[in-house]
Amino acid sequence: MVFKFPTPPGTQKKAGTTATKPAPKATTKKVATSTGTRSGGVGYRKYQGDALWLPNTTRPEWLDGSLPGDRGFDPLGLSKPSEFVVIGVDENDQNAAKNNKGSVEAIVQATPDEVSSENRLAPYSEVFGLARFRECELIHGRWAMLACLGALVAEATTGVSWVEAGKVELDGASYAGLSLPFSITQLIWIEVILVGGAEFYRNSETNPEKRCYPGGVFDPLKLASEDEERAFRLKTAEIKHARLAMVSFFGYGVQALSTGEGALGSLAKFADGLNNGKGL
């Protein structure tokens, strides 16, 4: 008895043999979708949530995220707006059997930080205010960025660590290998006059935004003068680098206290310790 089976589609018979050709399968191409806005390289997705300084924390109500680099970091509440309690007058009746003390009538919140040009040494009306903290952080961060870069460049070009830079100046002022006809006292006075004059001029500005970002000649390439969104991104990048620079220069100081070396010297000692298997 011989059984015959039906030939499946796509089967070709040749000389008593059977070769099965698989039928093409319909494939569906999946297209990756993203809810974020692509503004970077491959795989980049813009974070849409509220970026905070620590996960699972809540943002203080006085930090609304409108400032560049605002990540809700104020664990001590230093920038919280001041509140004043209005208490009524006590009943000072010496003939009464009992005098009631004044009760709380209202709680008044202080006005936002105001800048006055009358007092150029302390222009802000609120010492512990968000506007003043913001300006101080930005100015200190800019100095820290200059200091970190300046220390590395000076050590690499002169071989003198930033810790010993003051001692070198006592032997005689020089710049780019050229001797300067100034004593250390004269250089201090020149620095005080130039830097102090610049600070007095800056404190004459009553606009808090222009005090931090004057623009004009300080933005010769017009990087942030027209596009507000781009300007905000640049301000955020600046404050991030400023914070890193402040932490870095603090590290410079710790290294100098522990090793007695500058930035490059401490790095060389660290590398030698790793190569010799001594660790830190």
UniProtKB/Swiss-Prot annotation:
Post-translational modification, as annotated: Reversible phosphorylation plays a role in the State transition process and determines the affinity of LHCII for PSI and PSII.
Positions contributing to chlorophyll b 4 binding: 202
CC terms in the record's Gene Ontology section: photosystem I; photosystem II; thylakoid light-harvesting complex
Membrane topology, record value: Multi-pass membrane protein
Binding-site residues, chlorophyll b 1: 47
Transmembrane segments: 143-163, 176-196, 244-264
Binding site for chlorophyll a 3: 238
Pfam families: Chloroa_b-bind
Region (Disordered) location: 1-42
Extent of Low complexity compositional bias: 10-37
Source domain of life: Eukaryota
Binding site for chlorophyll a 5: 255
One Gene Ontology term of the molecular function aspect: chlorophyll binding
Binding site residues for chlorophyll a 4: 241
Sequence positions bearing Phosphoserine: 103
Modified residues (Phosphothreonine): 7, 17, 33
Induction: Repressed by high light intensity due to a transient decrease in mRNA stability. Also down-regulated at lower light intensities by low temperature or limited carbon dioxide supply.
Stored InterPro entries: Chloro_AB-bd_pln, Chloroa_b-bind
Keyword Acetylation listed: yes
General function of this protein: The light-harvesting complex (LHC) functions as a light receptor, it captures and delivers excitation energy to photosystems with which it is closely associated. CP29 facilitates the State 1 to State 2 transition, where State I is induced by excess photosystem I (PSI) light and State 2 is induced by excess photosystem II (PSII) light.
Record note on domains: The N-terminus of the protein extends into the stroma where it is involved with adhesion of granal membranes and post-translational modifications; both are believed to mediate the distribution of excitation energy between photosystems I and II.
Name of protein: Chlorophyll a-b binding protein CP29
